[in-house]
């Protein structure tokens, strides 16, 4: 099993060094809080000063990131009261820890490195026969995913959010059920929508406890798989309740919060109202499949071979109504958020302006690509996971994307990671090729971000980003 040892440590070191290089250049060029950092960094700095009664109403998330990142500074402040003779040193250290540079560094290195190690360990648990080399390359590819890698070195919630979801999953895989629940609580404190992925981890954990060897010959085994799990859950209900009560309590507490709060977000509710944007789920499927284009768009892939081996009549019988449904979704459930149209710093602005927003014909023309991508993703995951897990993964992906009006690629990060970890690992050649492609993309994106700024009419400097 690819577990622990030098490979996991080497992977973590490599990823940490990459984030450190990005941090070095951003610290030299982008010295002030950028984009949403303008909300996250001042809020954390308030907590660093012990002012927990201060809150910016424009912030939409729970304060998990700010609380965690304020802890080192608060410890230093406490140390200065215990050792007053060294208080000037403590004051300087506390300032550095909560500076723009310090917060970005801790966020990228700690959570970026943790996600890398957790990815490696999860691959070893889910795929016991995987070699250390293959686990290294597959985990590296996941952590180089350009949308994630770019965001991890900003003071955003993405890096910590993913790390805690992966920690909850790994602990569940290792039968540390209550610890997994605690990690899930942390994940939700970083980002509310992680309650959906906490539910996925719970479903995965329950399935493995009552039907540990449950595999299927495809989605046709869903009724049988569901029957086994329901029977097993009833028989072992007392044990399951003892093991998973923390995650269940989290779900109940979050439901109570939503009912009392009148929504999921904490602040800026008018701009973040849930709306049915089903087309975004299709974008998510295409983006995730496109990220592993060497796998999903390989003419020799298992999915393509399955299509080629099936009768044309059967393929047409299944594909035609699905394609019609996809076209209907695109026509009726495509939304565009005012932020997408107003902010030309984001690549999504240009995706909409130059293609998606040009006409309905342009959007509908992508329906076959969306269908192929979704089919390939389902087929690949179903090769290694039981039907209920496949269904749960895609249901959670839909829940975290299809209710968001804003076209935002960062919403796809967790599904990309979960799908990549639970699916059949890429071959060594394809994993290496994916790493190379991601690395090249990251270098290009970073160069544009740092060295190709432009000026807004008000004279402020703007930079291209996801």
Question: Residues of each region from the PLM?
Answer:
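Signature aromatic-anchored transmembrane alpha helix within multi-pass, membrane-resident enzymes
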Residues: 8-16, 311-324, 390-397, 427-452
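Transmembrane-helix motifs of polytopic, lipid-linked glycan transferases
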Residues: 74, 101-128
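Membrane-lumen/periplasm interface segments of specific transmembrane helices
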Residues: 187-188, 194-351, 442-455
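Start-transfer (signal-anchor) and selected internal transmembrane alpha helices
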Residues: 1-24, 314-315, 385
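Short acidic/glycine- and proline-prone juxtamembrane loop motifs at membrane-interface regions
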Residues: 34, 147-160, 408-409
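Extracytoplasmic catalytic/substrate-binding loops of multi-pass membrane glycan-assembly enzymes
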Residues: 28-43, 52-72, 411, 455
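Membrane-interface alpha helices of multi-pass inner-membrane proteins
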Residues: 138-140, 146, 166-171, 177-192, ...
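Short hydrophobic/aromatic helix or loop-helix immediately within or flanking a transmembrane segment
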Residues: 43-47, 55-97
């Amino acid at each position: 099993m690819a577990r622990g040892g030098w490979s996991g440590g080497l992977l973590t070191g490599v990823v940490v060094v990459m984030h450190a290089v990005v941090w070095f250049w951003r610290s030299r060029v982008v010295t002030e809080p950028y984009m949403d950092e303008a909300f996250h960094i001042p809020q954390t700095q308030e907590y660093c000063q012990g002012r927990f009664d201060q809150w910016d109403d424009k912030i939409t998330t729970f304060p998990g990131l700010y609380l965690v990142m304020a802890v080192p500074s608060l410890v230093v402040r406490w140390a200065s009261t215990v050792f007053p003779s060294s208080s000037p040193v403590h004051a300087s250290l506390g300032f550095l820890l909560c500076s723009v540079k310090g917060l970005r560094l801790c966020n990228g290195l700690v959570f970026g490195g943790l996600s890398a190690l957790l990815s490696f360990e999860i691959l070893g648990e889910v795929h016991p026969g995987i070699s250390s080399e293959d686990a290294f390359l597959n985990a590296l590819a996941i952590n180089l995913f350009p949308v994630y890698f770019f965001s991890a070195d900003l003071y955003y919630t993405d890096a910590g959010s993913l790390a805690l979801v992966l920690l909850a999953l790994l602990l569940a895989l290792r039968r540390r059920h209550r610890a997994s629940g605690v990690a899930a609580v942390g994940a939700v404190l970083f980002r509310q929508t992680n309650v959906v992925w906490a539910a996925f981890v719970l479903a995965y954990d329950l399935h493995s406890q009552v039907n540990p060897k449950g595999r299927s010959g495809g989605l046709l085994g869903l009724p049988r798989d569901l029957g086994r799990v329901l029977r097993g859950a009833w028989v072992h209900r007392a044990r399951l309740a003892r093991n998973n009560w923390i995650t269940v309590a989290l779900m109940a507490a979050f439901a109570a919060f939503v009912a009392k709060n009148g929504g999921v977000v904490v602040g800026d509710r008018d701009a973040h109202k849930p709306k049915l944007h089903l087309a975004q789920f299709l974008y998510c499927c295409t983006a995730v499949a496109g990220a592993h284009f060497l796998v999903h768009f390989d003419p020799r892939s298992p999915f393509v071979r399955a299509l080629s081996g099936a009768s044309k009549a059967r393929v047409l019988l299944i594909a035609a109504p699905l394609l019609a449904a996809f076209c209907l979704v695109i026509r009726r459930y495509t939304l565009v958020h005012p932020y997408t149209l107003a902010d030309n710093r984001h690549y999504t602005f240009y995706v909409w302006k130059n293609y998606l927003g040009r006409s309905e014909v342009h959007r509908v023309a992508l329906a076959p690509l969306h269908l192929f991508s979704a089919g390939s993703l389902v087929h690949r995951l179903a090769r290694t996971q039981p039907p209920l897990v496949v269904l749960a993964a895609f249901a959670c992906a839909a829940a975290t994307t299809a209710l968001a009006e804003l076209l935002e690629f960062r919403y796809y990060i967790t599904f990309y990671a979960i799908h990549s970890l639970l699916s059949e690992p890429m071959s060594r050649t394809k994993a290496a090729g994916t790493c190379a492609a991601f690395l090249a993309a990251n270098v290009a994106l970073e160069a544009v971000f740092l060295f190709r700024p432009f000026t807004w009419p008000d004279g402020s400097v703007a930079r291209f980003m996801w």
